[in-house]
């Protein structure tokens, strides 16, 4: 063979080896960029680890997911930065939120503070309980105004987001300017309805019409005048969704992969501002990535192996079961079956406790502010409440719940919604007692709780209809005094009488 041929052959061989090396390297890079479906999106995880992480994700996510669902339901009707008014007391349908009350008219607004502040103006309201509560994406009540907190006269607030850096308008000073911990905030307005007459309803409706809530730019454009909610334009909500959200009536029913999708929505919504100093949360979110929950990435169940998917579903159900176990353990002070959520026992980082409240009463006033509540799911003997039985709750008239405003005794089905009944009666309250609409005898008020309509007219007057199966109470105390707040008030038990 000639020398030139040998050189050519060597050169060709070198090129071939070089090409092969390049192809091999390219194959490695492509494999790294497009890995085959693994049992996680973020590295290996065992079924046991996946189950544990999913349980933690449920406990952490129950409240944010509930708030996300709440915002979705309301913003479909009213958009954002606009009040949606309930012009009549809430009934069993439509279902807008768990454990509502039937003694106040609600106003609900979903605020997006990422672009500009929101203005809220409340005209002077006399001789009537009212409050406006601001709640963040963790269901924490971060600001309140109302008849218990403010002097008589007009009350206004400029609500600004955590990242807003604009110029403050004149006319707002000191306490008028409030910074939200999150770009999202829910605003919940309550105005007491002291009677069920048409005159009382019209009075409260007229007050609703004079309450203004709008963005700062809209307020300036209106000449800083009152504008009815019905005259405000509807600004559609713009946040992540996934197909099927509209068919989900309650976040409490979410199972397995659906719950994971909702947690993914929460993590990918920039308006849901996370805690900057939440050490526990930061570590938990890092763990969530191992089962596909990560900001910047939509949760995709198809990337999970069957055994990992099953483990996640089991972990979520375990978290739900552990949270609901607090119904037996209690979260505060137990008084004859009533669980008074003592503020001293409340911890913002106790996710199991928070998940419990998220499941039974998403917007529960815990810890107490303008009002507080007490939950009851069992009778005085410790047995689950059921419409198959009859019960009584007996108050001594000289030892009624100590409040400055009013108390209310609502009854809910086992999922936390009003029970649809022929009387449209969902609660009894202190206004009814004061107006003589409840029967009292021998210094006592006896409430009759049962599914069947009582034949005795006196019992019928004090009847609180219950569903055929399980039910629960979430008593409300507006303007609660110390015995309610610390749990020392001796609340009468729910006594089975059949």
Give the residues covered by each predicted segment:
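C-terminal motif of bacterial Sec signal peptides marking the signal peptidase cleavage site
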Residues: 29-32
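A compositional/structural signature for long, glycine/proline-rich flexible linkers
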Residues: 34-498
């Amino acid at each position: 063979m000639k020398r030139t041929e040998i050189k050519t052959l060597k050169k060709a061989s070198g090129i071939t080896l070089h090409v092969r090396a390049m192809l091999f390297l390219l194959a490695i890079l492509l494999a790294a960029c497009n890995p085959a479906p693994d049992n996680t999106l973020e590295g290996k995880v065992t079924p046991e680890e996946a189950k544990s992480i999913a349980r933690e994700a449920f406990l952490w996510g129950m409240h944010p997911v509930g708030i996300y669902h709440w915002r979705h339901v309301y913003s479909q009707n009213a958009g954002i930065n606009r009040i949606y008014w309930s012009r009549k007391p809430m009934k069993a349908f439509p279902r807008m939120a768990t454990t509502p009350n039937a003694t106040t008219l609600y106003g609900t607004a979903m605020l997006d503070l990422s672009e500009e502040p929101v203005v809220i103006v409340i005209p002077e309201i006399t001789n009537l309980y009212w409050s406006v509560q601001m709640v963040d994406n963790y269901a924490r009540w971060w600001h309140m105004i109302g008849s218990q907190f403010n002097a008589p006269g007009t009350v206004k607030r400029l609500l600004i987001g955590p990242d807003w850096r604009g110029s403050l308008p004149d006319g707002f000073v000191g306490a008028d300017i409030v910074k939200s911990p999150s770009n999202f905030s829910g605003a919940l307005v309550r105005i007491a309805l002291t009677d069920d007459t048409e005159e009382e309803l019209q009075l409260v409706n007229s007050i609703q019409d004079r309450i203004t809530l709008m963005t700062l730019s809209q307020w300036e454009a209106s000449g800083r005048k009152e504008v009815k909610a019905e005259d405000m334009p509807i600004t559609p909500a713009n946040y992540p969704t996934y197909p099927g959200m509209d068919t989900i009536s309650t976040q409490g029913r979410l199972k397995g992969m659906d719950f994971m999708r909702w947690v993914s929505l929460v993590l990918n919504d920039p308006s849901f501002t996370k805690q900057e100093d939440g050490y526990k949360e930061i570590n938990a979110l890092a763990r969530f990535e191992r089962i596909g929950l990560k900001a910047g990435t939509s949760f995709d169940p198809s990337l999970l192996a069957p055994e990992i998917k099953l483990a996640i579903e089991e972990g979520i159900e375990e978290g739900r079961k552990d949270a609901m176990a607090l119904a037996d353990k209690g979260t505060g002070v137990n008084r004859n079956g009533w669980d008074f959520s003592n503020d001293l026992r409340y911890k913002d980082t106790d996710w199991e406790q928070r998940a419990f409240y998220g499941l039974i009463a998403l917007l529960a006033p815990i810890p107490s502010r303008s009002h507080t509540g007490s939950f009851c799911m069992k009778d005085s003997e410790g047995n689950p409440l059921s419409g198959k039985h009859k019960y009584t709750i007996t108050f001594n008239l000289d030892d009624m719940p100590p409040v400055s405003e009013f108390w209310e005794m609502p009854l809910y089905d086992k999922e936390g919604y009003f029970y649809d009944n022929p009387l449209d009666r969902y609660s009894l309250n202190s206004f009814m007692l004061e107006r003589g609409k409840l029967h009292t005898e021998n210094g006592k008020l006896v409430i009759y709780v049962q599914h069947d309509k009582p034949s005795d007219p006196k019992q019928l007057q004090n009847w609180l209809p219950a569903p055929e199966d399980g039910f629960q109470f979430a008593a409300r105390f507006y303007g609660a005094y110390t015995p309610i707040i610390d749990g020392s008030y001796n609340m009468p038990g729910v006594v089975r009488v059949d």
